[in-house]
Amino acid sequence: MYLLLCLFSSAMAVLALSSWAAKQGSGFAVDELTGQLTGIGDYRRAVVQAGAAAIGILVAILLSNIDYRSLVNVWPVHVVLTWGLVLPTLVIRNVTIGPLTIGYNAGDTDNYSWYKLGGFTFQPTELAKISFILTFAMHLNNVRSHLNEPKELGKLLLHLFVPIGIIHIQGDDGTAIIYGIIGCCMLFAAGLSWKYIIGAFAALAAAAAAAFAFFSDKIGKGYQWYRILAVIDPNNETGWAPSETVWKNIIYQQQRGEIAIGSGGIFGNGFFGGRYYSVPNAHNDFIFSWIGNAAGFVGCCVVLGVLLAIIIKTFATGACSEDMLGSFICAGIGGAFMAQIFVNVGMNLRLLPVIGVTLPFYSAGGSSVLMLYICVGLVLSVYMHNTKKLFG
């Protein structure tokens, strides 16, 4: 059932990406507001998505037959391999060696955390995320009886914040936030004391308020800060944008996404017919807006309902695990799914700033889909290697 839910999401993603490509390359690819042709069809993304999902399902089935404990025990291997790919991108930017580009910038941001090989791109922090979940689960399992002692908690926080710091330096704050939420979910599952949880939330709220009140004019004028301010003050009433051009550029993507979702109404305009509203990155970060336009409110509810079921199944598998190691792994993976879905949908609805977080299973990207199915395989491994079964 769990794998079928994931397969349904991948099938919906291929449908959405195929319709996006058809619109881009057909006579219907005329923007309703500008009246201009916005692009050329590109079915390659849909084909890559389908191929990656097919390979991913096979990988998930293979991993489900491998005891997750053995994968945790070989942590030095995957730590060296994954972070060995991440670290070069801290200092190497857009350096091409033959067909390989290290420190590739896949967008219009300061994020140089990608590798490009021919026509394919790969972000090693996605693979490192899986390694982090496994090593953090092992760390929690080893110290769970002393978790709330300041010394042990300090070591755990160091384990969490070192990768977050590395990813922040790369310029990928969206992924850094996801790592933070993963760590919080795993700490909560391990039984972190409420005094630490409440204290952490209070400290973060106070720090954010102080930073906004006293240092907002000094934090920087980069796109990330502007995107945060655009959510708080979308009409630029406080004059945060230095020019009207900057303001329009910052709000354009979310504004178009909001229009696309609203235009879908209850049942949508259809995947291969009806009105079309162009949205930048509609195949990637803003795929939810495309689905809203094509399938309407009902389609969005179906997509979110299936994703919610995947999250619940992930956490429930962890809750039924006979050992805490399996529980911690599922808590981390469930936290990753939950965080990405919440942030991505919030971006599309203009409730959160755009920080480059994709929608699991739906956003275009073969390597991302493969990483998701590796996570699915780990959850299935926890399920298969415990005598207690989900829901009895």
Features from the language model and the residues they span:
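Transmembrane alpha-helix boundary/anchor motif
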Residues: 58, 66, 135, 209, ...
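Hydrophobic, glycine- and aromatic-enriched re-entrant/interface helices and adjoining loop segments
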Residues: 99, 105-114, 199-302, 324-326
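Hydrophobic alpha-helical transmembrane segments
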Residues: 50-59, 128-129, 294-314
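Interfacial segments of multi-pass membrane proteins
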Residues: 140, 177, 182-196, 272-299, ...
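Alpha-helical transmembrane segments of multi-pass membrane proteins, especially transporters
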Residues: 151-156, 200, 231, 277, ...
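Loop-to-helix entry and N-terminal half of a specific, functionally important transmembrane alpha helix
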Residues: 317-356
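Membrane-helix boundary/helix-loop-helix interface segments in multi-pass membrane proteins
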Residues: 1-5, 11-12, 16-170, 335, ...
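Hydrophobic alpha-helical segments of polytopic membrane proteins
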Residues: 54, 74-83, 150-168, 173-216, ...
